[in-house]
Amino acid sequence: MAWYDEAVFYHIYPLGLAGAPKQNYYGEPVHRLNTLLPWVNHIKEIGGSALYIGPLFESVGHGYETTDYKKLDSRLGTNEDLTAFVAYCHEQGIKVIFDGVFNHTGRDFFAFKDIQANRENSQYKDWYCNVNFWGNNEYNDGFSYDNWGGYNLLVKLNQKNPAVVDYICNVIRFWVSEFDVDGIRLDAADVLDFDFMKALRRTANEVKPDFWLMGEVIHGDYSRWVNGETLHSVTNYTLHKALYSGHNDHNYFEIAHTVRRLQNMGTLKLYNFVDNHDVERIYTKLTNKAHFAPVHVLLYTLPGVPSIYYGSEFGIEGRKEYGSDDSLRPALNIEDYKDSVKTNPCTALIAALGKVRQAVPALSYGSYDELMLTNRQFAYARDLDGTRVIVSVNNDDAPAGMHLATGNCTAYIGALSGEKVSVQDGHINITQPANSGEIWVPEGTDLNVKPVKAQSVNVENTNSINTNIEASSVDTEKATDMVVEDTQSETTKAEDTKAAAPKAETAKTASENTASETTAKESESESTPNATASDDPADPSTITMDWSKSPESMTVPELQAAVLAKLAGNGPVDAQMKKTVVDNIWHDSLVNWLKSFR
């Protein structure tokens, strides 16, 4: 057992939260990171035990086009500020992981600048993939190179070059010795070289006990990445999609099927989330805002490691607009939310869930056993050492009765509501309120959690919320009460996110709009895929497969067809599964997805 096995994560995008300018002119440091120190106390207050913060290091724009891996972004402050920040987190019992952007660098990175200056004579010409001095690009460099996602601002590192591997491993050692970081989230892990990741894992094992490596992976068999030689965990995008769509469609079968499929991959501790810096806020994604409560009960109790993205505990909105992620990464002042645990039902619920999670080991280590499943009701058990904890959720607008098998005890207590129910003939009979969830623990469990008694609601950016509500009873019901009248359909704009080829001078500005780093990552995006990644619009269902071709040599439609064929070999492929494949238009991601089938 390691600290990350029972962690509750809080995710901060620091450049956004601290209100940093979108473009970095490499001026004198501005100590914005220090303004985030009060957020550490907030994390602790809502039951968090770990912080994923990033990106942090010097870059020209959104942070994912690194200029210097060993220097805090000057828009945030100095290395001394970062050392002090991590130390303060540790004093408060909060572990810290950084964003490791090791798939690519920015164009201002020293190795790339040397290639620009010395061309064929550069000692770093093999640090990047497919540098071709007969080619050119929109920056008029006089050479071309591989990039991430079609954006030449993000220059792909040659992860098979031993010098690159050594350099990045030394970066990890530096981060530990200089900042005492506890782990790393690997950006774009689904396109990282596997031998490279194994080298990172060996370094992780060397630098610090229980040093955690978690990778950003969108699709595929997660066990290919999560194992004893590669990573400890990956992002659970599969569950992310199921959690909001399973509620929007009143279809708990989707969530249950997703959990079963993930369970079949092995005993993986995946990084669970409902939103992050790349995808729209859960409050925005939910058609019925009252589903905020059951969604988060599931997030905190299903197998895996839960994470909350900063601000979402307040119920704020965030929608992708015009291909930009700016609204997903806002500047917030913690003083505006200082009483939120008492006054905001959403925050009160998140705080209660965090404390229950930390108090009940079965939620971190217990086995998973499905107890009841309908479109609108779902219940399961987490069993550990003879103790059964039961989770029940209801996405219907009416209360629902549930008859659930129990463990060896005489009564259960609702950890969120405080309600007591007696065991009769090995079962409990409960009435789950509308649009709510509960965690049933054996009577006598030491929770140190009181039922939430929020008094009023004051949530930013949620115009549909009644901000003058008197809340008085069960926490999950209170999170429902504030929004029960708002069931309007989600109206996500399907904007064309195709980025025009940037000019040599203007491409540096903010990198811009963060679309260059993240547009492709939102696997559930409603936008129609465009020709940024592939100019071939062929329907994959019409492709005649040539299985003699390697995945790397296949076109995007061929890869899509191959993935669909592999999925079909495992069982029926429904419309949503096909959409997920067709929406993925990124060659490297599809190659890795296809390779993940065994």
Where are these regions (language model features)?
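Conserved, mostly hydrophobic/aromatic
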Residues: I12, I43, I53, Y69, ...
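Substrate-binding cleft of secreted/luminal carbohydrate-active enzymes
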Residues: G304-E317
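Structural preference for beta-strand elements that scaffold enzyme active sites
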Residues: A7-H11, A50, K95-I97, G183-R185, ...
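Carbohydrate-interacting/catalytic domains
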Residues: M1-Y52, E58, Y88, F314, ...
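Active-site clefts of carbohydrate-active enzymes
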Residues: G266-T287
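Active-site-proximal helices and loops of the catalytic beta/alpha 8
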Residues: V86, H90-Q92, Q116, S177, ...
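Substrate-binding/active-site clefts of carbohydrate-active enzymes
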Residues: M1-F9, Y13-S49, L56-E178, L200-E206, ...
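Basic helix-extension-helix modules of the SAP/HeH family
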Residues: P540-R598
